């Protein structure tokens, strides 16, 4: 074993019939963690079902069905390798919680792969007003997925097949709309592929001799290549934010006999280590960390991405709960958010949203009702420019800047300061009706808080 490869997360987006499953299935099948036995089983079933042409999508359909039924799938199935990376596909749309997962940031994607279908009429349907191509791309941008790869799929079904003219026509159109939502086309590889036949997936295709390859220009270094796999290999790996102040939203708080209170959660930014004096918001409780554990082993320090449990002195289960945020009391400690301003995009609300609307917000691990106190402005969701001041309502498809007031104590942050604590989903009627990114927060100065004895000594 040489040096471990870097882990990166991708999200695969695009219109419903663009071939996301086939393309993803192909990568997992050829470069991934599915063993030969499973593949043979799938192939046999596909043949018996008359899907003899064996679409790679079959692999994904099987996995999805298991995922939907709540069977935990061997997660290796959603991974594949490139020369440089272990790639995890963190979600594929079509999964009902896709949008919620993307926002509450079960994991943050490092790159989005936008799949567009090049068949006659197919591309047009996907990019039309009702298509999902734009919505998914806009979501990725809004939620801070900075890198993108565009896979122009189904090149085998253009007229004539593998048409250079059609490819050029499509990338011109895609470049124009992704530029409008805030991506720079010069940094994006455009790869003509057939996810089904494998053209330009792992090896350059003989069917598209006209294709000279993709190239990107970016400050981290230029890159070029011919295949989708090479494009994935050129993703810029994320900088894990260890240098930021600590933010650790709690997923649970356990009471363990003989040990005491053990909060559990994922470090989003900064580091946590024994001896640190931490403050929990919004409760404003300050105490000392006795020990930090991951997988039952004690750690000298936990970093972003680590799921840890840690032991606290003199804090009861009543003091803190899921949704509380742990921070370093000496370095920009987290505080209760009295109100916050956010840019929201209304996605599928049957009526309209006006001042006074009070749905539940899912932000990091918190799940709290917040009131839309004021609609400040309506903005063009494609350009972000203001189109109207103090609108009466926002309806599906609209974007706006709003002021929100939590109905119970809550701790959130501006997206630019702490991204994982600065994006949220608005849930109502058992679905995601809007998504938002927090622009600014009015914080409580938190003068009245509880400080344990050990924390006072440390001061």
Curated annotation (Swiss-Prot):
The modification 5-glutamyl glycerylphosphorylethanolamine is found at residues 301, 374. Residues 5-242 form the tr-type G domain. It holds the Pfam family GTP_EFTU. Residues 70-74 are annotated as: G2. The keyword Cytoplasm applies. It comes from the Eukaryota. One of its GO terms (molecular function) is GTP binding. Residues 14-21 are annotated as: G1. Residues 153-156 are annotated as: G4. GO terms for cellular component: cytoplasm. Residues 194-196 are annotated as: G5. It is found in: Cytoplasm. Residues 91-94 are annotated as: G3. Keywords: Cytoplasm, Elongation factor, GTP-binding, Nucleotide-binding, Phosphoprotein, Protein biosynthesis. Its main location: cytoplasm. Belongs to the TRAFAC class translation factor GTPase superfamily. Classic translation factor GTPase family. EF-Tu/EF-1A subfamily. This protein promotes the GTP-dependent binding of aminoacyl-tRNA to the A-site of ribosomes during protein biosynthesis. This is Elongation factor 1-alpha 4. It comes from Oscheius tipulae.
């Amino acid at each position: 074993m040489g040096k471990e490869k870097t882990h990166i997360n991708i999200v695969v987006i695009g219109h419903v019939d663009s071939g996301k499953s086939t393309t993803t299935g192909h990568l997992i099948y050829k470069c991934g963690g599915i063993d030969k036995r499973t593949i043979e089983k799938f192939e046999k079933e596909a043949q018996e079902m008359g899907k003899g042409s064996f679409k790679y999508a079959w692999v994904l359909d099987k996995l999805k069905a298991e995922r939907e039924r709540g069977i935990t799938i061997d997660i290796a199935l959603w991974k594949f390798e490139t020369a440089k990376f272990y790639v995890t596909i963190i979600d594929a749309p079509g999964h009902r919680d896709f949008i919620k997962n993307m926002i509450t940031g079960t994991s943050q994607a490092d790159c989005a792969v936008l799949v567009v279908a090049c068949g006659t009429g197919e591309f047009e349907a996907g990019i039309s007003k009702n298509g999902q191509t734009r919505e998914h791309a806009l979501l990725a941008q809004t939620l801070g997925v900075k890198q993108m790869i565009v896979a122009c799929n189904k090149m085998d079904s253009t007229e004539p097949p593998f048409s250079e003219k059609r490819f050029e026509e499509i990338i011109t159109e895609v470049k124009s709309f992704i530029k409008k939502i805030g991506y720079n086309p010069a940094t994006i590889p455009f790869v003509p592929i057939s996810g089904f036949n494998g053209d330009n997936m792992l090896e350059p295709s003989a069917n598209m001799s006209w294709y000279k390859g993709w190239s990107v220009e970016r400050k981290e270094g230029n890159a070029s290549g011919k295949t989708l796999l090479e494009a994935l290999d050129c993703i810029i790996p994320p900088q894990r934010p260890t240098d930021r102040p600590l933010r650790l939203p709690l997923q649970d708080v356990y009471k363990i006999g003989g040990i005491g209170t053990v909060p559990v959660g994922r470090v989003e930014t900064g580091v946590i280590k024994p001896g640190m004096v931490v403050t929990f918001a919004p409760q404003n409780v300050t105490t000392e960390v006795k020990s930090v554990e991951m997988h039952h082993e004690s750690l000298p320090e936990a970093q972003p991405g680590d799921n840890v449990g840690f032991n606290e002195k003199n804090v009861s289960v009543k003091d803190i709960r899921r949704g509380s945020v742990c921070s370093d009391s000496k370095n920009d400690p987290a505080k209760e958010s009295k109100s916050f301003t956010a840019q929201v995009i209304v996605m599928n609300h049957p009526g309209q949203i006006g001042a006074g609307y009070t749905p539940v917000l899912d932000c990091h691990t918190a799940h709290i009702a917040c009131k839309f106190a004021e609609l400040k402005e309506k903005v063009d969701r494609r350009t972000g420019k203001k189109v109207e001041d103090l609108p009466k309502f926002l309806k599906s498809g609209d974007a706006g800047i709003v002021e929100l007031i939590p109905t119970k104590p809550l701790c959130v942050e501006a997206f630019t300061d702490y991204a994982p604590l600065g994006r949220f989903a608005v849930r109502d009627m058992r679905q995601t009706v809007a998504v938002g990114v927090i622009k600014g927060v009015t914080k409580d100065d938190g003068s009245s808080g509880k400080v344990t004895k050990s924390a006072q000594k440390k001061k």
